[in-house]
């Protein structure tokens, strides 16, 4: 279980898979998709899982054009995120065009592709973990990131300021985690259901954590981000359900071995002369009139 560049995005998983070695956690595809904030949102949206409206931009695009498109399609305030970084690195809130230009410029120092999405001003953030595979999975208890006096706003809750603004960047973890989350039974059940749907839609395996946003004005719930290798495997969320850390590790290993056995029994080659027959057909068809 590792964290960082090239080990959460499917790179390491692909390397291990080449040697037919079992490994815990998500496979190559789900790891890569989970790391790409835009791709994961598009897939979830296509499967009727609620996500915030967003746009993706590349480094070669003019900042003025980016600002114009955002103002026409998303509206302020917005969140600017590097597309494939974790731990809230490079995430900035923008409430006007000047802040957006600075935020975009800042985000492009971390990645060549960025995500810009609508910000919820009156939000509650809730996290939920999922454990299992494509056949069966369970959702954990839910936790809430409770805002303190230092992080009352959405901007402070994420990361405030960019490299040009001189603002102090604060971690999302500056808040206090409240376990269980202060949400209704209906909200909890919906979050757990959406968590499991997200898990299966992205083809995950093992333990992941999904971050949700609740709009307290509308009570709408959105999937925010997927963490395919959560810190400490989000054990504290499972402890609330009676799952011990050793049980969590055993289950991770069990699922890894199960997947490896299934892959070993798959057929990855198919002997056929279909291409040869196609080529012969082309040769035999020379000179034919249509």
Segment roles from a protein language model:
Residues 1-35, 50-56:
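A short, GP-enriched loop/loop-strand-helix hinge that lies immediately N-terminal to
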Residues 3-4, 88, 145-148, 227-239:
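Glycine-rich phosphate/pyrophosphate-binding beta-alpha loops
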Residues 12, 36, 187, 191:
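Hydrophobic (often cysteine-bearing) scaffold residues that line and stabilize catalytic clefts
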Residues 23, 54, 80, 116, ...:
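Generic preference for hydrophobic
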Residues 31-123, 134:
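Active-site nucleotide/adenylate-binding loops and adjacent lid/helix of ATP-dependent enzymes
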Residues 48, 176, 182-290:
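ATP-dependent carboxylate activation and anion-phosphoryl transfer catalytic cores
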Residues 95-171, 182-187, 221:
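Phosphate-binding site of ATP-dependent enzymes
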């Amino acid at each position: 279980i590792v964290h960082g560049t090239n080990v959460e995005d499917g790179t390491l998983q692909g390397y291990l898979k080449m040697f037919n070695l079992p490994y815990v956690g998500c496979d190559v595809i789900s790891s890569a998709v989970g790391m790409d904030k835009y791709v994961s949102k598009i897939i979830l949206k296509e499967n009727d899982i609620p996500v915030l409206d967003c746009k993706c931009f590349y480094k070669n695009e003019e900042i003025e054009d980016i600002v114009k498109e955002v103002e026409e399609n998303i509206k302020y305030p917005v969140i600017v995120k590097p597309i494939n970084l974790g731990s809230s690195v490079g995430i900035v809130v923008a409430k006007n065009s000047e802040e957006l230009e600075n935020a975009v410029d800042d985000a492009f120092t971390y990645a060549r592709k960025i995500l810009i999405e609508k910000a919820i001003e009156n939000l509650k953030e809730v996290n939920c973990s999922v454990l299992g595979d494509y056949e069966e999975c369970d959702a954990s208890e839910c936790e809430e990131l409770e805002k303190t006096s230092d992080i009352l706003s959405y901007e402070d809750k994420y990361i405030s300021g960019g490299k040009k603004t001189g603002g102090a960047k604060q971690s999302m973890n500056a808040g206090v985690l409240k376990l269980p989350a202060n949400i209704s039974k209906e909200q909890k059940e919906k979050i757990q259901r959406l968590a499991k749907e997200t898990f299966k839609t992205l083809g995950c395996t093992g333990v992941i954590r999904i971050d949700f946003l609740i709009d307290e004005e509308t009570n709408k719930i959105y999937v925010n981000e997927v963490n395919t290798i959560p810190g400490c495997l989000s054990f504290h969320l499972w402890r609330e359900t009676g799952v011990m850390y050793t049980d969590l590790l055993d289950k991770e290993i069990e699922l890894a071995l199960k997947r490896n056995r299934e892959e070993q029994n798959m057929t990855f080659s198919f002997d056929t002369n279909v291409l040869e027959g196609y080529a012969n057909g082309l040769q035999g068809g020379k000179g034919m009139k249509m």
